[in-house]
Swiss-Prot record:
It is found in: Cell inner membrane. It catalyses: phosphate(out) + ATP + H2O = ADP + 2 phosphate(in) + H(+). The gene is pstB. Residues 28-270 form the ABC transporter domain. This is Phosphate import ATP-binding protein PstB. SMART domains: AAA (SM00382). GO terms for biological process: phosphate ion transmembrane transport. It is a peripheral membrane protein.
Amino acid sequence: MNAEAIQTPMTVDVKADDKPYFDAPSKMSAKNVSVFYGDKRAIDDVSIEIPQRYVTAFIGPSGCGKSTFLRSLNRMNDTIANARVEGEILLDGEDIYKSGMDVVQLRARVGMVFQKPNPFPKSIYENIAYGPKIHGITGSKAELDEIVEQSLRRAGLWDEVKDRLGDSGTALSGGQQQRLCIARAIAVDPEVILMDEPCSALDPIATARIEELIDELRGRYAIVIVTHSMQQAARVSQRTAFFHLGKIVEYGKTSDIFTNPREERTKDYITGRYG
């Protein structure tokens, strides 16, 4: 990073629809959440509101806990034997860690797109159809065809694959595979989409397409994205949370975080003094 960047806070384009925070209804809420791996505390007493139809970015240095916290929002940490979560995480006011919670159904409501594209070793069609089938969303082939088409359209992939739906999803390019994974997530009609470094394995052209897609999708979903790229956070999000050492140091409008941070540690990070 050059000397000028170190001296000057990052500039971001403020979108016209970037309304004040209190105008955005909360979709998910975390209250005093801590995450442990055995005796190690990875997340320490984090509270945050995730607004509906906004993109919320989690930024911070490697190992700061942002991906761990993201995974707690749909209980992906349950797959780790020694992990445990304390505190409350609410989806529309319901504690997702309560006894009796249907975790499979939760993960349909709160979908996940991972860092590396992970299409199933199935056809493009079956990659999208799999979720609606196992969740009993549709009972007819015609309805399933419609879900597949609409999901691929929303992911900006339909025109590229409509004539080869029987081809393997793994034969697509990296950027296409990631859009296929996004289409797979939205095929079960989620309410929240979590994205863990979704562009880190993609080239700049594919990254730009995914960022355009994120902006299009936020009109329907609450989206939370973990990114190491502050430029990407500035481009795609309306809210940004800066994590450091397992805590949220600062959370607010993206334009404020990057141009007028309240906390000195936030300013130091976004101006490249550490991280």
